[in-house]
Amino acid sequence: MDLSKYKAPLSPLSSSVTSSLSKEVVLMEFNDPSHSDEIVKLDILDGVYKDKKNSYFVKCTTLMQEVRPLMIDWWFAWHLPDSERYQLWHPLDHISSKLTQDRSNLHNDKERYIGINSYVEEYIGKKYSKLCISFLDPKEFGLGALDINASTAICARVTDMDTGVKIANLLHYVENNDIGSKMQSYFWLGNNLEHDNKLINSFLTYFSKIHFLKGLFINNKLAKDLLRHCYEEMNHLASFLPELYKDIGTSSNLDKSL
């Protein structure tokens, strides 16, 4: 499948975005992902927030012209199995993407990505990361039933593959608006470090309490780089997704999208 018509360089970020990126990190206590039903209703300004335990909360808003929530669900179902598709999203930072499960036979977009593990390699700032992104049912983030025609929520747990440590949670909450949709992206970094190995997990629990050590790995720079990365990839996605979805995302063209 030829994707060349959808490939384009990143556009410069708007003045409002660069203003948000220039803000200092704000000291603030925040709720964990299980309270997402409350969090998405709050008027939280874009930026980076840090609590007293050196955990981070990142908020990023993207206005997506002519993009509807169902297109976002389709995008996550469609792009995950293929590195070239993944690179469309951020042509500079995204390197590779693969799945170990094949759900291409399913026609419901949510069923094609919820419950799977996506293995990606990408840059966040100058940091090269190998990550496993485990997509979860929004109910696990405390979100109730969503009307696919009005809203959607992409929820995931992120594991660093070099260490096996679960380091972050993410939520992309998308709602219809007058121009298309509004995406509110939230990231929680370091608030609940976990490992599948019980011994290592016990160490992580102790390690997390030593805040200055935790700050050596999860810090202001990483959080601010993540904010910039999210602004770039989501604004870029909005620039080509309407045309991509029109060409291959509709039900009449489903076979071509696999």
Give the predicted meaning of each segment.
Residues M1-K52, Y173-L258:
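Terminal "cap-and-tail" regions of soluble proteins that handle hydrophobic small molecules
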Residues K5-A8, P12-K110:
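Hydrophobic ligand-binding cavity/cleft-lining segments
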Residues E24-D32, Y56-V58, D137-G144, A150-A156, ...:
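A generic short-segment signal for beta-strand/edge and adjacent turn/coil regions
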Residues F57-K59, V165-L171:
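Short, surface-exposed coil-to-beta transition loops
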Residues E66, L143-N149, Y173-K182:
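A short, structured loop/turn motif at beta-sheet edges
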Residues H94-V165:
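Glycine-rich portal/gate segments that line the openings of hydrophobic small-molecule binding cavities
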Residues I133-L136, N169-N176:
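Broad, structure-driven detector of short, well-ordered beta-strand segments within folded domains
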Residues A150-D162, L170, K182-G190:
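Beta-strand-rich recognition/accessory modules
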